Amino acid sequence: HASMPIGAYSEKQIMPQEKLVIVPDGISNEIASCIVLKGITAEYLLHRSYSAKKGDKVLFHAAAGGVGQILCQWANAIGCTVIGTVGSKEKEAIAKKNGCHHVINYTDTNFVEEVEKIVGKNGIDVVYDGVGAKTFEGSIECLKVRGMMVAFGNASGYVHTLDIKKHINAKGLFFTRPSIAH
């Protein structure tokens, strides 16, 4: 998968060796290109946007998606308590199988109330939100004092405004909107 510098849609590209990954036999280029982007995304979310550590309480929206499946397994392996949200009954088993200790279907359940039942009133250390508009306000409610909101996607729509007094001052929260290009 070649994305930087210019040439992502080229049939061939000259790349620096340190930017390349050897693909094992038996894995097609199509599969490898999908895995690499999702894996890179999971890595920068879990280690560069917020450095998750053993004992952290993590909330990941869209836990059954490509990035979610990788990140939830990884966070579980680190020793985090992993809470994942999904948008359908079918995806609950996928999220559970891929490292979520707790799975919440946010289409038929108030995920804010469920998170509080799981972790108590102190809240979540970090929320990884790739959903966007539908989950943004609730995600903020779930965070602990000085918690971190990592907003990396907008599958349900963009969050157009951020009320600093309401969203940040109330709990002293941290926000980031990371990009793998940086």
Language model segments and positions:
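Hydrophobic/small residue at the entry helix of a nucleotide-binding pocket
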Residues: 41, 66-67, 134
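N-terminal Rossmann NAD(P)H-binding glycine-rich loop of SDR-like oxidoreductase domains
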Residues: 64, 68, 72
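NAD(P)H dinucleotide-binding glycine-rich loop of Rossmann-like/cofactor-binding domains
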Residues: 1-62, 74
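Glycine-rich phosphate-binding loop and adjacent beta-alpha segment
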Residues: 78, 86, 134-182
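NAD(P)H cofactor-binding loop motif with strongest signal on the N-terminal glycine-rich segment
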Residues: 62-63, 131, 154
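Adenosine-nucleotide cofactor-binding segment
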Residues: 76-138
